[in-house]
Amino acid sequence: MEESWDFEFLSRMVDSLVSFLSEFVDDWLANDMRVAVFKILFSWLVVSLVAIHFAWKVYGNTVNDMYYRQGTGGQNGGTPDTHLSGWESAAGDAMKTHRE
């Protein structure tokens, strides 16, 4: 019983996709306004992805080094523990440490 429902659902999905594509091709050939907007947006997407790719090629190592820079304040080079504000250092609590 479920197999016929799956086939029917799949058949409807394929039919709707084919009808959408045929309508899109008709609009494309007629040079409809929706196609012009699609071309502009698709061109913007492609140009943006190419620009991101080239920017990553140029600045990728710098960004990676900034994220993983070595320092005394932890994994990402945060501020050291000696630069606590007045109320944090005045509390007098012992610093918590990680124990396994």
From Swiss-Prot:
Pfam families: T_cell_tran_alt (PF15128)
Membrane spanning stretches: 35-55
Keyword Transmembrane tagged: yes
Main location group: membrane
GO biological process: one example: osteoclast fusion
Keywords tagged on the record: Membrane, Transmembrane, Transmembrane helix
Location relative to the cell: Membrane
Keyword check for Aminoacyl-tRNA synthetase: no
Family statement drawn from the similarity comment of this UniProt entry: Belongs to the TCTA family.
Protein name: T-cell leukemia translocation-altered gene protein homolog
Organism field: Danio rerio
